């Protein structure tokens, strides 16, 4: 059985993330969607909220499990016996950022990184952009799953 990990901050999960998850789930026997802590990013949702949203939007995917992790993603992969890391690429900047990490991960443990290009309709979507546009009153309902949109609106309304 081939197990892969699709890591991210998912703050919040977008339809672009979900597209990558669905496509990766069709490729691998088992996919673990893992949300971790990235100290360089400020968070709107805490880890448990992000896990809840991911579980809700991935509920229809029988071979997908949602888990949290701390530390290095390659250590998490080793702990759960995952053979690959799946990362979505929106464009060249993502590749420039992800390539050295993929090379380091392979150096540390031999875990391979599989890059999936984002569908053109989601290429401009990022969690950061969704949060910024939503905080300024813009309509992001087409960019996030409905359950996530409700939570996002409630969180921003609460201040």
Curated annotation (Swiss-Prot):
Transmembrane segments: none annotated. GO terms for cellular component: cytoplasm. The record marks 17 as: Transition state stabilizer. One of its GO terms (molecular function) is ATP binding. Keywords: ATP-binding, Coenzyme A biosynthesis, Cytoplasm, Magnesium, Nucleotide-binding, Nucleotidyltransferase, Transferase. It catalyses: (R)-4'-phosphopantetheine + ATP + H(+) = 3'-dephospho-CoA + diphosphate. It is found in: Cytoplasm. Its EC number is 2.7.7.3. Its main location: cytoplasm. InterPro entries: Cyt_trans-like, PPAT, Rossmann-like_a/b/a_fold. Pathway: Cofactor biosynthesis; coenzyme A biosynthesis; CoA from (R)-pantothenate: step 4/5. Belongs to the bacterial CoaD family. Homohexamer. Reversibly transfers an adenylyl group from ATP to 4'-phosphopantetheine, yielding dephospho-CoA (dPCoA) and pyrophosphate. This is Phosphopantetheine adenylyltransferase. The gene is coaD.
């Amino acid at each position: 059985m081939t197990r892969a990990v699709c890591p991210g901050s998912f703050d919040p999960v977008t339809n672009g993330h979900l597209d990558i998850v669905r496509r990766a789930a069709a490729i691998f026997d088992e996919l673990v969607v893992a949300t971790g802590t990235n100290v360089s990013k400020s968070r709107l949702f805490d880890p448990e909220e992000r896990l809840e949203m991911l579980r809700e939007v991935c509920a229809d995917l029988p071979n997908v499990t949602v888990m949290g992790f701390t530390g290095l993603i390659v250590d998490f992969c080793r702990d759960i016996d995952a053979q690959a890391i799946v990362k979505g690429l929106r464009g060249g900047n993502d590749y420039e950022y992800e390539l050295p990490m993929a090379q380091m991960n392979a150096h540390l443990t031999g875990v391979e990184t599989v890059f999936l290009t984002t569908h053109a309709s989601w290429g401009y979507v990022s969690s950061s952009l969704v949060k910024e546009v939503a905080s300024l009153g813009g309509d992001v309902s087409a960019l996030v799953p409905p359950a996530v949109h409700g939570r996002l609106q409630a969180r921003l309304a609460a201040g």
